[in-house]
Each structure stands twice: as C-alpha cells, then as structure tokens.
UniProtKB/Swiss-Prot annotation:
PANTHER family: BIOTIN BIOSYNTHESIS CYTOCHROME P450, P450, PUTATIVE (EUROFUNG)-RELATED. GO terms for biological process: cholesterol catabolic process; novobiocin biosynthetic process. It comes from Streptomyces niveus. This is Cytochrome P450 NovI. The gene is novI. Belongs to the cytochrome P450 family. Heme binds at C357. Together with NovH, involved in the formation of a beta-OH-Tyr intermediate in the novobiocin biosynthesis pathway, an aminocoumarin family antibiotic that targets bacterial DNA gyrases. Acts as a cytochrome P450-type monooxygenase with specificity for the tyrosyl-S-NovH acyl enzyme (L-Tyr-S-NovH) to form the beta-OH-Tyr intermediate (L-beta-OH-Tyr-S-NovH).
Amino acid sequence: MSTRPTVSPSELEQIDLASPVLHAEYELDEIFRHLRADEPVYWQQPRNEQPGFWVISRHADVNEVYKDKEHFTTEHGNALATLLTGGDSASGAMLAVTDGVRHHQVRNVLSRGFSARMLDLIAHTLQETVDGLLLAALERGECDAAQDIAADVPLGAICDLLEIPHADRKYLLGLTSHAWSTDYADEPPEESWVAKNEILLYFSKLLKERRGGVREDMVSLLANCRIDGDPLKAAEQMANCYGLMIGGDETGRHAITGTILALIQNPDQWRALKNGDVDLNTATEEALRWTVPSLHGGRKATGDVVINGRRINAGDVVSVWISSANRDETVFDAPDEFNLARTPNKHFTFAYGSHYCLGHYLGRMEVYAVLDGLRRLVGDLEQIGEERWIYSSILHGMSSLPIRITG
C-alpha cells in the first residue's frame, strides 16, 4: 500500500548502503540491478568517519565469498553494523562469528539440539500455533499480521527448542525485536544495546539454573556439554543462546510477514496457493527467496584476493548482498516476479558454506506451516493500512502490516 521512493543508480555515490534509514525508507532494486550489471564488486567510499567497504551483488560472486574460508573470516563480525564499528564483541564465542576448528566443534554441539525427535515435536506444536493464531485473527476480522500472527510463530518454535518458560516469552520478543532493528529512524542506539544485554543476562540466569540438570533442551545442552573434556566457556554459552534466540525469532518473523504481504500484492499467487496448484515445499522456498529477512552477510578479508576481476586487500570489509543475489537475472527467470511454483530456487536466504544457517530446517517449517494454514483456513486477505518497515541494515521486514482476514 505504501510506495517508497526508488533510488536511482545516478545517486549511488551519495547513498550509504550501511544506513538503516536507506533500507527502511527507500526501494533499492534499481541500485542493485545496476550493480549486478555494471559494478558487481563495488567499493563504497568512506562516509564521514565510517570506513569504506566492498559490495558484492552477483549470485556467483556471493557464492564464491561464502565458500572461501581461506581469504574471508567472520571473526570480526558478520554484518556491516559491527564490521564498520570495531568488530563484534561475541567474536570467537558465538557460532556466527567464530571460524576454524572451534566453529566446527561448537556447530557439532548445537546440531545435536536440532535432533529429528525435537524437530518432530516442534512441527506438531507449530501447526497448532499457526492454526490458532489464524482462527483468532479470523474471529476478529482485522489484525496486524506482523504483530498478531508472524510474531508468535517463530517465537514459539525457538522458545520450544530452548524450553523458555511461557511466562517469559513475550518479554523476550520485546527484546529481540529491538536488538538488531528499530521501529523508528530516531530511536536511540542505546535501546539496541540495552536489549542485547538484557537477553544475555536472561540467558546467563537460565544457564545457571540448568547446569547439572538432565533436560534435553538446547539451553541445557550448552550448559552441560563438553568439548575435549572441557565445558564451554560461560561467554560461549550465553552468546550462542543469544544467537539462537535472535536468529530463530527475528528472521522467521520477517519472512512470515513478508510472505503475507506478497500474497496480498500478488492475487494470482494467492489463488494458486488456495487452489492447491503449487507444492507447499516449493512455495516455501519462493517465500524465503522473495522476503530476504537478512539483507546481507559480512566478512573481513584475511588476505589479498581477486573477486570477479577486482582486487580485495587483506583487512578490507566485504558485504555480500543476499537481497541482490536472490534477484540475479542470470540465475532466476523473471526474478522480480513472486512465483510460488519456481524451481529450481537456489536462493541464499540461509547463507551458504560453513556458516549455512543451523536453523534452516526450523525456518522452513515455520513458513510452510503458515502457508498450509492460510490455504486451509483463510478465504481472503486484504491490506487495510500502510505497512511499517523496520530500520536496520541487516534485517529486512515490517513491524506492522494491518490486514483484513476472512474465512
């Protein structure tokens, strides 16, 4: 319903691709179309006191960076917000910003928490949650899809995985929604800092409670596991609980809200979903490609390397733009069309390589459950107010999407 102004390629030298305001208030499709065609490995010059950085926009080049563990690292941060401001304080502790042997060891520990038994339990609860939210929305007739539907689906799933007490879940939702994004351009940055630290403090207390216990949830796994005979450091335990909570809640929430908006804006695809003309697994992949809940990934070059003819020097900050790679014309037919029957669908929504999203299966389950529930229970969707986009340079989604929903 809202129409954001489009940024022209002629303005490329004036804009800052690390700006949350830019991503919230403007459409950048023409910018990335230009970059893919003419400047696929682009150097954004320093802006005021902010360092310059590389912008990688083509699918093939994004793939190359993701695979290259020899020349690129996440240990200084995996997003521009941290890479350009001195690095990530969780470096070497949280899986997403750890490389090498320790990354492999911690990933193996966390993988045990995503067991088939646990995921089967979550899948059953997940569909019940989705159906309940949709039925409640249908009874009211109008709702905010972002707040009344999308917010509770991934929150419930990741909290089930971590066995977060139900009484604490809304509190954590309020924190995660402000840890990496804000609802307003002028929201003080201290809000984000406070939210992140409150999440860490919460998990510090929960880990202490579960140390020495026999529960099988992910928090207990981190609290009690050993690697080469030694327990994880307290910082590793807290940082990985934090990473699971943020990754499991934020990205799923934005993917679901974006999917609902896409179905409203593309009535032919809504009909295809309702009529059973598309496979739900295939539709899930297109929803994930289209919504791009994470705009980019970040790396720092550890050595000189050439990407698509451009020399990247050791120490340079590199950003790989999932939002652009997922619309690459050389990989996807009609990439600017939302097509639930699209196959193959080689999107980068869950990244790639050694840092491929550990919770990818859970994320797919969430979107699948929403599509399934919409197909079975909902007759029509209509947007009745302007959507409100979040302010973030890493996350892409809405904090509000008012809709009318009928059976």
